[in-house]
Amino acid sequence: YFGGSMSENACFPLLPIFKFLGTKFRNINFYSKMKNDVDMFTKAVFRYDHAVASFQVGLGVKTEGSLTIAGTKGYVYVPAPWWKTDYFEVRYEDQNYNKKYFYPYVGEGLRYEIKDFVVAILTDGYYFSKVSKEENLMMAEVQEIYILGKNVYKL
């Protein structure tokens, strides 16, 4: 699985999922299109107590690149490309309650992750203003679950 879409790209969609829903999901399933034992495309589906989240990552495949986090009362939609967006929407069945949130984002979102990484190196102790220790550990655990082949369905 080394060098595939999960190992190279999964950290990007995992961060907003964990920010919105937390790291305490009930289970996760992966659906992967393999080529020479490397996942070229993977869809992951998380089940939480009161929500579902999914993401798709790929190498050499095209996908919309949007992000959707579904819940029991509505869902969060971040348009493509979600890692560069400057707004997201919270949508409900009654569209009168829908709301768009705008925020300033200088450059690409990766810029903020790099900043936190540099600050962690330059300061004593573990410091991440945007990504918590718990979120980082769970990102690594999701990768481990995938690498060990747990709940991985090859297409």
Regions found by a protein language model. Give the residues of each.
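Helix-loop-beta segment of a Rossmann-like dinucleotide-binding subdomain
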Residues: Y1-S5
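C-terminal "lid/loop" region of Rossmann-like NAD(P)-dependent oxidoreductases
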Residues: N96-V106
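Active-site substrate-recognition segment that forms the wall
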Residues: G109
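Contiguous beta-strand/loop segments that form the cofactor/metal-binding neighborhood of enzyme cores
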Residues: E8-K84, P104, I114-Y126
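C-terminal helix-rich "cap/oligomerization" subdomain common to oxidoreductases
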Residues: D116-L155
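Short polybasic amphipathic segments
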Residues: L67, K84-Q95
